[in-house]
Amino acid sequence: MESIDWVVVEPGSTYIGSSNRAVMFGAPGPRHEVSIQYRYEISDSAIKLSEVVTSVESGEVDISSESEWQLAFDRGLISEGLGIEVLQDRLASSYWGKICDGRPFHQRNSSLMVCREWRGREAIPRYLPANSETEHMVRVVRRETREPNPMAPRLPIRPPRTAVMREEALIILILGIIPSFLWALFNASPGYIETVSYTHLRAHETKAN
């Protein structure tokens, strides 16, 4: 690995995920803090996976996790890359159940590769199909320790039921009731609004029960 330039990342915390509803905004949540308690090195630039796959398979290096990548980016240690970089994490739909100590998160039945897409000096989260044929550009890491933290915090396996019900009610309101009323306001005959209101409210009450 003599050809790789490394930068050192000291322990610290970063934030991952979106606080927006994934189904409405296309960004997995919840937003959460990750505390990395170990020192590690990350490659100064992205590398073709095909060039380091042997070293990854031998355990000499590892592909960077999303948290490790983000902490290095937050500190200005990596910048102005090109295109899309693939990280080690894999998601199905959310971060629920993730252990928040910096290790990669592999969700059961995962179908999405967690990535970062460079846009000038900014890097935004991207989620590509796991079977994507995009050439994989990765950053590799060398960790001070390979032992997971047994006391690391973990997100709940699933979101609180009250939060889910509140989000579903908001989706029904935004995508169902409000558009119906707006359409009725300009197009419907008298009495249509009362019918739509009753129908939507009954449907929501039935689902809640």
Region roles according to the model:
Residues 18, 51, 73, 94-95:
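Activation segment
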Residues 42-79, 83-86:
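Conserved hydrophobic ligand-interaction patch in extracellular adhesion modules
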Residues 199-206:
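Conserved small/polar residues in nucleotide/adenosyl-binding loops
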Residues 32, 84-188:
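Surface-exposed recognition segments
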Residues 2-57:
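A short glycine-rich, aromatic-capped structural motif
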Residues 13, 40, 46, 67-68, ...:
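Short, flexible loop/turn elements at secondary-structure junctions
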Residues 186-198:
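Membrane-interfacial hairpin junctions
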